[in-house]
Amino acid sequence: MSFEYPDNLKYMDSHEYVRLEGDVATVGITAFAIDQLGDIVFIELPEVGDELSQGETMGNIESVKAVEDIYAPINGTVLECNTAIADAPEQLAEDPYNNGWLLKIKVSGPAALDKAMSASDYQAKVEG
């Protein structure tokens, strides 16, 4: 099965995506990861104002199949959490790249996305 991977995003090995606009990063979970998880029943996100460090756990996502950690793809401070998705996590699968974002992070320091993949590289990794 093939999924959408927008070219304007960067993708992490742990299946988070990042849309960087100036010093604000919008973070979410890829369509591939959502499909692998199945029906999502709960999302735990950090609080507004929390400091995040790249690679550290920043929350988790629970489905009928598993509970998986969500990792911070970038260093920064949480500006906003998508409370609509937290309140109705089943909607995440409907539009993961637009309305399905999880967090907005004010990036601290240079945007270190050197480990991030392009859309085509991520697609090759997950779809073989």
Curated annotation (Swiss-Prot):
The modification N6-lipoyllysine is found at residue 65. CDD domains: GCS_H. NCBIfam families: gcvH, PRK01202.1. One of its GO terms (biological process) is glycine decarboxylation via glycine cleavage system. This is Glycine cleavage system H protein. The keyword Transcription does not apply. The glycine cleavage system is composed of four proteins: P, T, L and H.
